[in-house]
Every structure is written in structure tokens, then in C-alpha cells.
């Protein structure tokens, strides 16, 4: 399950199990609940603050929990709507958010990164990838709007329709990430960026973000059903 650490006024949300490396950090329903609980804890803190998300080992996050999905196909629409709530939470979070992408970010994990204000990626290893086209899995209304709004149009076309794997330098060139640095500098670089923005924390920032992301937020609030999503 995810856990929190803190560096000064910056909260660091680790997406995997404490003390373990190379977890895929997939979005199991329990993981989603735990993530929301930790974000509640961060929001309850008073004073200047910012948020960094990261993980340890090979994966930032591999996205949807496919094992859970195939065991619960009848619950897939509700599960996807629950995933949307994490993206929504980050898009309107009342403090600066920075994804420290130290490993692979695939599928919904790539979307988790793009739902944050800024992204720092490892430059020498790891990929940013949307493999849905190769898995015969469509994007939900909310996911599609998130990606086409947060990426440039041609980058979205390439990423969503070809499943291209972007290494750090390519992701930087495509505007997917804001920095691509050596592996041992990813977290420090993200924390430094977040630290410079702790004074922006507050309701005004949430209002600004809601105005900026209104179309995405409305799309993420669209209920997933057979009229707009068909898997398999």
C-alpha cells in the first residue's frame, strides 16, 4: 500500500509498499482507497505545502490492476469511475503536485503522472507509455479528455494510437515531462521544484486549477457505461 514521507514542507507520496522495491503499484481498489486516505492526511496539514508522488525500483506505476479487472469484469465500469477520482483529486489538489517518475509509467500510471502539475522523469531508464491500443482496450471519456488536454495534440495522437514507449529524453522533447535527469536525481529534482511552490497552497490554487481543467473534470465525472465504453 502507498505511504507518506516528508521533506520539509513537501509531502512525498510513495505509490508502493514501504520497504519493498519493484512493486508494480497497480490501482487495486484497496490501493485507491489508501491513496485517497493519504491525500486526506496531506490536505489536513495546515500551512505551506506541496506534494510529490514517486515510487522505488523499476516501476512508478503500471496502472490498472488487470488481475482484479479480469476477476471482476462485471464491476469494471464502477472501478474505472473510481480510478477517475484519483485523477480528479490530483488535478484540483490545493497545492503544487510533482510526479517524480523514477521508473516505468504505463497506462493509467502514465495518466496519473499527467494529472499532476509537473513531471520529472529518469533520463536513462524507464518508459512513459499508453499501451491500450495494443491491448484492445479503449480509453474512457475522462481518460481521453485528460490525455488530449494535457498533451499536445500530435503527442496525444502518437502516444494513444501507436503505444509508443517514450524514454526520458523523448518524453521531454514531446512535452510530456518537464525534466529528464539522472536516476539518483529524480526525487531531489522533484522535491526542489515542489519546494519552490509551497507558498501557493490554498483554496485559491484549487479554484485556478478547476478553471484550467474544467473540461477534463467534467469528462472524468462522466459515468462509465456501455454507451461510452466497450472492452473486449
Enumerate the predicted regions with their spans.
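Glycine- (often His-adjacent) and acidic-residue-rich active-site loop
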Residues: 27, 54-85
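Catalytic-core regions built around general acid/base machinery
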Residues: 38-41, 82-94
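Short, active-site-adjacent cap segments at secondary-structure transitions
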Residues: 58-61, 106-107, 215
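Crotonase-fold acyl-CoA enzyme core
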Residues: 92-200
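Charged catalytic carboxylate motif
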Residues: 30-34, 82, 89, 189
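Terminal peptide-recognition signature
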Residues: 13, 35, 53, 65, ...
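Amphipathic alpha-helical segments at domain termini/boundaries
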Residues: 1-14, 159-199, 204-220, 224-232
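Conserved CoA-thioester-binding segment of acyl-CoA-metabolizing enzymes
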Residues: 1-54
Amino acid at each position: 500500500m502507498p505511504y507518506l514521507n516528508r521533506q520539509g514542507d513537501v509531502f512525498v507520496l510513495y505509490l508502493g509498499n514501504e520497504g519493498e522495491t519493484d512493486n508494480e503499484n497497480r490501482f487495486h481498489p484497496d490501493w485507491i482507497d489508501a491513496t485517497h486516505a493519504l491525500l486526506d492526511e496531506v490536505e489536513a496539514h495546515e500551512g505551506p505545502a506541496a506534494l510529490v508522488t514517486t515510487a522505488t525500483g523499476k516501476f512508478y506505476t503500471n496502472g490498472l490492476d488487470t488481475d482484479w479487472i479480469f476477476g471482476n469484469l462485471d464491476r469494471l465500469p464502477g472501478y474505472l469511475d473510481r480510478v477517475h477520482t484519483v485523477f480528479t483529486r490530483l488535478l484540483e489538489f490545493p497545492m503544487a503536485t510533482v510526479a517524480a517518475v523514477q521508473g516505468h509509467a504505463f497506462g493509467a500510471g502514465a495518466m496519473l503522472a499527467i494529472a499532476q502539475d509537473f513531471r520529472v522523469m529518469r533520463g536513462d531508464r524507464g518508459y512513459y507509455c499508453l499501451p491500450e491500443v495494443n491491448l484492445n482496450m479503449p480509453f474512457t471519456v475522462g481518460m481521453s479528455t485528460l490525455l488530449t488536454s494535457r498533451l499536445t495534440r500530435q503527442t496525444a495522437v502518437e502516444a494513444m494510437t501507436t503505444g509508443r514507449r517514450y524514454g526520458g529524453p523523448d518524453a521531454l522533447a514531446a512535452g510530456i515531462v518537464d525534466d529528464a535527469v539522472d536516476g539518483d536525481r529524480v526525487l531531489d529534482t522533484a522535491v526542489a521544484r515542489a519546494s519552490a511552490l509551497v507558498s501557493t497552497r490554498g483554496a485559491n490554487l484549487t479554484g485556478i486549477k478547476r478553471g484550467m481543467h474544467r473540461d477534463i473534470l467534467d469528462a472524468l465525472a462522466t459515468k462509465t457505461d456501455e454507451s461510452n465504453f466497450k472492452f473486449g
